[in-house]
Structures are given as structure tokens and as C-alpha cells.
Amino acid sequence: MTPFEPPAAVPRPRLERLVSGTDVRARADRLRVTAAYALMLLAVSVTLTALGRHARAAVVSEMSTNLHNLAHGHLGALVGSAFVSDGGDVYLWLPGLVCLLALGELIWRGRGLLITFAVGHIGATVIVAVGLVAAVETGRLPFSVARATDVGISYGAVCVLGALTASIPLRLRPAWIGWWLGIAVAAAVDADFTAFGHVLALLLGMALSFRLPSIPRWTGMHAALLVVGAAFAYFVLSGSSPLAAPVGGLTGAVIAVPLAGRVMRSTAAGSVSPSPFRPGSDSPSTVASRSPA
């Protein structure tokens, strides 16, 4: 009579292995910047809501990166404005922002995400400020714009979106670029300076994307983060132009795809220069070497 043998261990399902404690902790460690920023946004929002409308208005006024504050040396607003929201609806858009930032941090690590967000938030703010100064001095805009409210995360978030360009598969990249540029430009027509800042932040991100690491292989998790993050970015960019934005995006994609194909064909044709000599015939150097002395 054979002794009892315990049944062989059955391997755990793949899903269970993927969500094991070690794997979850490893992924969480790679999202420290995203998690810390989200918690700070929540903490600031909860605190300002508890303090009341007057306290929120005072903080928003102090942290606004408008011409008045920048001209008076309030350079701390360039950083502080990224943690303050003009409204109390942070709970509605924070999940989308977290997905967008998480995807960026998974691809570029924490340092890359910080650099990208800072380039968009500070870079677009400074460029917009220079443009506003010129517009006010030439009389194109009233002087009251110098005290306009300008806080929030949108410039940095849009720059992160643009910086994903190099990670988009090559065959889809022209449509990606045309779609987002079309939306941003359409929303900027007859809009305030914030919409123009979004265009600048998007262009800064796209330019920066080719100096950042690109994703080696897309997974289901990456795709899910992109879908949610892109939906959030769409609502940020479309702003007060919900009808013009999709038309602009489709127009941009329709223009960008054939234009990119034409550029690639011309580049490929220019890189191949046909030789004037048939295969096997004498080259100029060979002919010269055979000439009499």
C-alpha cells in the first residue's frame, strides 16, 4: 500500500501572480512622485475648503502667476500655483490626472516626470507672461489682465501629454500629433490666454518627448492609463469649446497623416542617390587608373 502523496501544487493563475503583494509594492514604489503630488493636491484642497471661500480666494490671488505677482517678485507663485485649484472640484479630475502622471512616471521615472511637468508648468507660464506684457503695452489687451487668476495643474499636465509622443507607435504618431494640436489650436481661437498656454505646453512636451525614454512595450495597464489620462487631457484642452475641439482634432489628424507620409517618402527618396554607373561597369577611379601615364 503506497503512502499518501499530497497533490502537486497547482500554479497560481496569472492574474493572481500579477497582483501579488511584491508586484503591487514594486509598482507603487515606481509611482512615488505621482502619489505624493496627488496627496498634496488633496490636502491643499481639503484645507482651503475647510477655511472657506474668502481664504481660498486669498490663496488663489497670492499664488496666481499673473503679471502683477510676477512683476512684484512673487516667483514662488511659479511653484505654488501648481498646488492650488481655483475651484473645489479636485475630486472630479484628480483620478484622470493621476492616470496621466502615473503613465509618465512609469516610462520616465520620477525625475523625468518632475522635469517634464516643470517644463510645461513654468515654461508655458513664463512665455505666456512675456506675450501678455507685449499685448498690454501695445494696447491689445486691457491692463486688468495683469491681475487675472492663473493657477492650476493644466500646463504641466498638457506638457506630460505632449511628452508621450515619442512613446506612441510610429504608425500612429502623426495622427496623435495632429489630433492634439488640432484640439489645442481650435480651443485657443477666441479664447483667453490660458488656452494659448495649453498650446505652448503641448508643443514643449512634444519637443521634449524625443529627449526622454520611450516605452519599450505597451501593456494593458499602460493602455488603460493612457485612455483615462487622455480623456482627462481632452477635457482640459477643449475647455469652453466642446464643439470646436473635436472638429479641430479631426482636421489636424487628417492633415498630419498624409503630410507625414509625404515627408517620409521624400526623405527616403533623398537618402537613396542612384549611381550613374551600371553594376559591374568601371567606376571613375577605375577608368582614371587605366589611363596611360
Predicted segments with their positions:
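Hydrophobic alpha-helical transmembrane segments of integral membrane proteins
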Residues: 113-144
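Membrane-interface micro-motifs in multi-pass membrane enzymes
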Residues: 143-163, 168, 193-201
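Hydrophobic, membrane-inserted alpha-helices
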Residues: 77, 94-102, 157-163, 178-187, ...
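Alpha-helical transmembrane segments
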Residues: 31-44, 175-181, 225-230
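Membrane-helix interface "capping/anchor" motifs
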Residues: 106-112, 164-175, 210-221
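N-terminal signal-anchor transmembrane alpha helix
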Residues: 16-60
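N-terminal TM1-TM2 helical hairpin plus the immediately adjacent luminal interfacial "cap"
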Residues: 49-110, 132
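C-terminal transmembrane module of polytopic alpha-helical membrane proteins
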Residues: 1-24, 187-293
